From Swiss-Prot:
Keywords: Cytoplasm, DNA damage, DNA recombination, DNA repair, DNA-binding. This is Holliday junction branch migration complex subunit RuvA. Has three domains with a flexible linker between the domains II and III and assumes an 'L' shape. Domain III is highly mobile and contacts RuvB. One of its GO terms (cellular component) is Holliday junction resolvase complex. CDD domains: UBA_RuvA_C. Residues 65-143 are annotated as: Domain II. The lineage of its organism: Bacteria, Pseudomonadati, Pseudomonadota, Gammaproteobacteria, Aeromonadales. The keyword Magnesium does not apply. Residues 144-157 are annotated as: Flexible linker.
Length: 206
């Protein structure tokens, strides 16, 4: 089991990064809410991980805090929720926002997430409400304290590259091609980074 990785980010392709750890490159997928907080390419990062083994693949999912990973694992326990849907849910809203939606039984907000219909939203609330009780009040979602201070400032890419990468990220999270292209075209502005475009796109759909 791989529980934590510390290395240098050598590639970013939302929602995936390539992390160099002692000369070995690890591919990790992160919720966009975690991706936004990553340092720039070329800098060190500490990633809390969840390892998934399937018949056809071995996958690593990354998080900034152990508590975010705990929420991911709690989502996986819910009926009908796999890693891809859990990743999409945690990309569409922060951990605190999701817990708040569950506590308030806010079906209307949950159904705006990709892959979450009314029945899935209702099931998530029923299955997770007791397990998540008190998470926000205990302030569990705090940054991983072992991580060194980092520069989060990303470098700007050409506008067409930013747009295509933002659309690709939304597709990877489960959004439909037409929806992804439309929302990105609406929110993109000059000088925006890929992460900024994705953040605004996801925010506009909630």
């Amino acid at each position: 089991m791989i529980g934590r990785l510390h290395g240098i980010i050598i590639e970013k392709s939302p929602p995936e990064i390539l992390l160099d750890v002692g000369g070995v490159g690890y591919e990790l997928q992160l919720p966009m809410t975690c991706f936004y907080e990553l340092p720039a390419v070329g800098q060190e990062a500490t990633i809390i991980t969840h390892f998934v083994v399937r018949e056809d693949a071995q996958l690593l999912y990354g998080f900034n805090t152990r508590q975010e990973r705990t929420l991911f694992r709690e989502l996986l326990k819910a009926n009908g929720v796999g890693p891809k849907l859990a990743l999409a849910i945690m990309s569409g809203m922060s951990a605190n926002q999701f817990v708040s939606c569950v506590e308030r039984e806010d079906v209307s907000s949950l159904v705006k997430l990709p892959g979450v219909g009314k029945k899935t939203a209702e099931r998530l609330i029923v299955e997770m409400k007791d397990r998540l009780k008190g998470w926000i009040s205990h302030d569990l979602f705090t940054p991983y304290t072992d991580a060194a201070p980092v520069d989060h400032e990303p470098s700007l890419a050409p506008a067409d590259t930013v747009e295509s990468e933002a659309v690709a990220a939304l597709l990877a999270l489960g959004y439909k091609p037409q929806q992804a292209s439309l929302v990105v075209s609406k929110v993109i502005k000059p000088e925006m980074t890929v992460e900024n475009v994705i953040r605004e796109a996801l925010r506009s759909m909630l």
